[in-house]
C-alpha cells in the first residue's frame, strides 16, 4: 500500500511541484489591477531545511548477556508500613484530608488524601536508612543475584506493580478482565491540582475498583515500592504534577495526559523515561535470574515463563529527530552508562543546533522544530549491564524510538506482500509524546502502527516458547500493554485512540484541563468583537457539507455585498479566512475560483503545500491590497507561523485545534489597528466542535453555547 506522506523530513508542509494541465487553467488567485510595482511589498521567508539522511536501525548485533543489580536486603516497604501503622496508633493528629469538589456535583467525586509534612518526613527517613545499602552486596561471584533477590521478585512481589502486572497475574482474574474489556467500563472522576481532573476507568468486574490512585509525594517512597535502586540515584525530585501522575504511570495504567506544555514537557519526559528504564531493567533481571535457576536444575520440571516472543519491550513514538535526542539525554541522565556504542554516529545524524532565524518564533514552535526537525527516523537501543548500544537491530533491542513515518516504512516492504511487524509482537509499553504534533504530520501512520502491535509473530526468531508468558501465547498481549500518550490538548483522533487501542485490563486514566478560554487572553491595544455562529449538523460525516452550505449562504453572502469591482480596500478591509482542514480548504478555494458569488473578489491562498516563495508573494499582495481575501490553513500556520499584516477581519471556517493559534490569529488584527475599519472575528462551529470550543470559549461557557435553544449566535467583546 502506498504511503500518504503529508509531512516529510526536509520539507515541512510543502507540496510537490505541479506541471501544466490540459484544458482550462485553474485559477488559484485573483489580483486587483494596481499601478504599484508587484515586488514593492513582497516579503521573503527563509525556510530551514534539514539535510540529514535517514539512518536505518541496522547495526552489528552484540551479545544479549548482561549483569544484574541487586535490591536491598531488607523489606523496606514492610518497614515503612509498620512505621506508618505505629504513627496511626499514637496520639498525634490523624492525617489531613481535603475534599476537592468539581464545579458541578458529581456522584463519583472522591476524596484525595494528601500526606502531611510529618508523613513525608517519616517516609524519607525510612528510605534514607535503606538507601545506604549497596546493591553489590547481594551479587555473587558470577555477577548474578544472591538469595536476597527474592525480595524483588518473591516475598514482597505483591507490593510491586511490575510483578502484579507482568510477573504473576492471577489467571482467573485476568480472564474475567479481558472478557469485560469488550463491555462497558466503570469510571470515577476526581479533581487533581492546578485545574486538572482525571477520569479513571476500569473493566466492570466484581471487586475491581476504579478508585483514584493516591499521589506519590516522595521519590524515595516510589523507589521502595516500584523502582530499581540504581535508577533512583539520579532521579530528579518530584513536583506536584509528577506526584499526581506517578501512581498512574508506575501503576501500569494506560494514561492519556492532555495538558502537555513547554514548561512541563521536560519533567514529563524524565518521568516516562524513568518508567521505561525501570521496566526494561526489571524485565532483564527477571530473565537472567530465572536462567540461572534453570541452569542449576538437573531435571526439566521447573517452568518459568518470563518472556515474550521477541526482545523489544518499549516503543517510543516521537515527532522529530531532535525530540529523540532529548529522550536519549533523559535516559543517560537517569542511568549513566560507562560505555555508549555509536554515540557519535547518533549525535551526528540526529542532533542539530537551533536556527537563529527562529528567535522571534513562539516557544512551542521552537520546542517542536528546533534543532533537527526531520520526521523520518527509527532507532534501536540495547541495554547491557555497563553499556548502551545505539542503532542495534530491532530484534536485539530493548527500546525502539521512531517517528510514525519512519516506523511504518520499516514495517511495510516493497510491494506490500508481507509486513515485517514481528519485532512489535511483544511490546509491553508504548509511549506517544507530543501527540498533537503527530496529528499535524499524518495521524494515519500512528493508527497503522497501533494496528500492528502485539500480533502473533509469523516466524520464531529464536524464541524459547517454553518461557513465553501464557497470555502472549493466547494472543492477549494488547490487554496487558501499557500505553502512555502526552498531548497539549485532546482531539477526536486521540479520543478514538483512547477508546479503541488503550484496553489495559488494569485500567486507564484520562487527565484533562479545565480551560478559562483562549479568547480571554488576548494582547491587543483595541477591543475586538468576537462572534460565534452555531450551525446545525446531523452527524460528523455530514458536518463538512453543512459547514460549507452555511458558509456560502450566510457568511460569504454577507461579506460579498461589500466586495464589488469598484470597492476600495479601506471600506472592505483585508479578510483572512482561516480553514483548519485541507479538504475544506480545497473546496472553498474552488468556490472562490469558479463561483459567480466571488467573481469580483481578489484572493490569495496559503496552505501547507504552498511554496515559501508563493506564500511570501500572497502575503505581500494581501498587505498591499491586491488581495482582498487570503485563504489560510491551520497546518500552514503550524509549520510556518507567519506574521500576516493588513488583516482587519477574520472569518474562521472552523475553530483551530491548538488554542495557541487563536491568539496568534487575533493578534494579526493589531497590525491594522490604525485603520478606519473596526476589527471583527466571525467563527463557525457545530456541536461536533465541543473539544475545540471548550479551549477557546472556556469550560464554563461551552455547555450553554452548544445547547442554548434561545439563539445560535454568541458575541463577546
Curated annotation (Swiss-Prot):
Main location: nucleus
InterPro entries: P-loop_NTPase (IPR027417), UTP25 (IPR010678), UTP25_C (IPR053939), UTP25_NTPase-like (IPR053940)
Key words of the record: Nucleus, Ribonucleoprotein, Ribosome biogenesis, rRNA processing
GO (cellular component) term, any one: small-subunit processome
Basic residues composition-biased segments: 1-23
GO biological process, one term: maturation of SSU-rRNA from tricistronic rRNA transcript (SSU-rRNA, 5.8S rRNA, LSU-rRNA)
Location(s), subcellular: Nucleus, Nucleolus
Compositionally biased intervals (Basic and acidic residues): 24-38
Region spans: Disordered: 1-147
Biased composition (Acidic residues): 118-147
Recorded GO MF terms: rRNA binding; U3 snoRNA binding
Quaternary structure note: Component of the ribosomal small subunit (SSU) processome composed of at least 40 protein subunits and snoRNA U3.
Role summary: DEAD-box RNA helicase-like protein required for pre-18S rRNA processing, specifically at sites A0, A1, and A2.
Similarity annotation: Belongs to the UTP25 family.
Protein name in the entry: U3 small nucleolar RNA-associated protein 25
Amino acid at each position: 500500500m502506498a504511503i500518504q506522506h503529508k509531512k516529510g523530513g526536509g520539507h515541512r508542509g510543502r507540496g510537490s511541484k505541479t506541471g501544466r494541465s490540459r484544458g482550462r487553467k485553474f485559477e488559484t488567485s485573483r489580483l486587483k489591477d494596481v499601478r504599484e510595482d508587484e515586488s514593492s511589498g513582497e516579503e521573503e521567508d527563509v525556510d530551514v531545511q534539514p539535510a540529514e539522511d535517514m539512518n536505518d536501525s541496522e547495526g552489528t548485533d552484540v551479545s544479549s548477556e548482561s549483569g544484574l543489580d541487586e535490591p536491598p536486603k531488607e523489606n523496606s516497604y514492610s518497614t515503612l508500613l509498620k512505621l506508618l501503622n505505629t504513627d496511626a496508633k499514637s496520639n498525634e493528629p490523624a492525617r489531613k484530608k481535603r475534599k476537592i469538589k468539581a464545579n458541578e456535583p458529581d456522584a463519583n467525586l472522591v476524596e484525595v488524601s494528601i500526606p502531611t509534612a510529618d508523613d513525608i518526613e517519616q517516609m524519607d527517613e525510612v528510605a534514607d536508612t535503606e538507601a545506604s545499602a549497596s546493591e553489590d552486596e547481594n551479587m555473587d561471584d558470577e555477577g548474578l543475584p544472591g538469595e536476597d533477590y527474592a525480595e524483588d521478585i518473591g516475598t514482597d512481589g505483591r507490593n510491586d506493580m511490575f510483578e502484579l502486572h507482568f510477573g504473576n497475574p492471577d489467571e482467573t482474574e485476568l480472564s474475567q478482565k479481558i472478557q469485560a474489556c469488550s463491555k462497558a467500563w466503570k469510571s470515577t472522576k476526581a479533581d487533581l491540582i492546578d485545574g486538572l481532573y482525571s477520569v479513571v476507568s476500569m473493566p466492570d468486574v466484581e471487586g475491581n475498583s476504579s478508585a483514584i490512585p493516591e499521589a506519590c509525594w516522595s521519590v524515595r517512597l516510589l523507589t521502595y515500592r516500584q523502582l530499581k535502586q540504581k535508577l533512583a540515584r539520579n532521579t530528579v525530585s518530584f513536583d506536584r504534577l509528577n506526584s499526581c501522575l506517578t501512581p498512574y504511570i508506575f501503576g501500569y495504567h494506560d494514561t492519556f495526559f492532555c495538558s502537555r506544555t513547554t514548561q512541563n514537557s521536560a519533567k514529563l519526559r524524565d518521568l516516562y523515561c524513568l518508567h521505561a528504564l525501570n521496566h526494561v531493567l526489571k524485565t532483564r533481571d527477571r530473565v537472567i535470574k530465572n536462567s540461572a535457576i534453570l541452569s542449576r536444575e538437573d531435571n526439566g520440571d521447573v517452568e518459568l515463563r518470563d518472556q515474550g516472543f521477541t526482545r523489544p519491550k518499549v516503543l517510543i513514538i516521537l515527532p522529530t529527530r531532535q525530540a529523540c535526542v532529548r529522550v536519549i539525554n533523559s535516559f543517560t541522565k537517569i542511568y549513566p552508562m560507562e560505555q555508549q556504542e555509536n554515540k557519535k554516529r547518533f549525535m551526528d545524524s540526529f542532533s542539530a543546533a537551533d536556527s537563529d532565524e527562529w528567535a522571534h518564533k513562539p516557544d512551542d514552535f521552537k520546542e517542536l522544530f528546533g534543532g533537527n526537525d526531520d520526521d523520518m527516523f527509527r532507532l534501536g537501543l540495547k541495554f547491557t549491564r555497563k553499556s548502551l548500544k545505539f542503532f542495534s537491530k530491532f530484534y536485539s533491542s530493548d527500546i525502539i524510538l521512531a517517528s510514525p513515518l519512519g516506523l511504518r516504512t520499516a514495517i511495510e516492504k516493497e510491494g506490500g506482500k508481507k509486513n515485517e511487524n514481528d519485532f512489535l509482537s511483544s511490546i509491553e509499553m508504548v509511549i506517544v509524546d507530543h501527540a498533537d504534533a503527530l496529528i499535524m504530520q499524518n495521524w494515519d501512520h500512528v493508527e497503522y502502527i497501533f494496528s500492528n502491535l502485539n500480533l502473533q509473530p509469523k516466524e520464531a526468531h529464536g524464541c524459547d516458547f517454553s518461557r513465553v508468558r501464557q497470555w502472549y501465547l493466547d494472543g492477549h498481549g494488547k490487554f496487558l500493554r501499557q500505553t502512555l500518550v502526552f498531548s497539549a490538548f485532546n482531539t477526536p483522533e486521540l479520543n478514538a485512540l483512547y477508546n479503541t487501542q488503550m484496553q489495559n485490563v488494569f485500567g486507564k486514566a484520562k487527565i484533562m484541563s479545565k480551560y478559562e478560554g483562549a479568547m480571554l487572553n488576548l494582547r491587543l491595544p483595541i477591543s475586538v468583537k468576537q462572534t460565534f455562529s452555531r450551525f446545525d449538523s446531523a452527524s460528523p460525516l455530514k458536518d463538512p457539507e453543512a459547514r460549507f452550505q452555511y458558509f456560502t449562504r450566510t457568511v460569504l453572502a454577507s461579506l460579498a455585498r461589500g466586495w464589488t469591482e469598484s470597492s476600495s480596500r479601506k471600506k472592505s478591509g483585508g479578510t483572512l479566512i482561516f480553514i483548519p482542514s485541507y479538504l475544506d480548504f480545497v473546496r472553498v478555494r474552488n468556490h472562490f475560483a469558479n463561483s459567480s458569488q466571488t467573481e469580483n473578489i481578489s484572493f490569495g491562498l496559503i496552505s501547507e503545500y504552498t511554496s515559501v516563495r508563493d506564500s511570501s508573494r500572497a502575503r505581500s499582495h494581501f498587505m498591499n491590497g491586491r488581495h482582498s481575501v487570503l485563504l489560510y490553513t491551520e497546518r500552514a500556520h503550524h509549520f510556518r507561523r507567519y506574521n500576516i499584516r493588513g488583516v482587519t477581519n477574520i472569518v474562521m471556517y472552523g475553530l483551530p485545534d491548538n488554542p495557541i493559534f487563536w491568539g496568534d490569529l487575533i493578534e494579526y488584527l493589531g497590525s491594522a489597528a490604525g485603520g478606519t475599519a473596526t476589527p471583527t472575528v466571525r467563527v463557525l462551529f457545530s456541536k461536533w466542535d465541543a473539544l475545540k470550543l471548550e479551549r477557546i470559549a472556556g469550560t464554563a461557557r461551552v455547555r450553554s453555547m452548544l445547547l442554548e435553544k434561545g439563539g445560535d449566535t454568541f458575541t463577546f467583546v
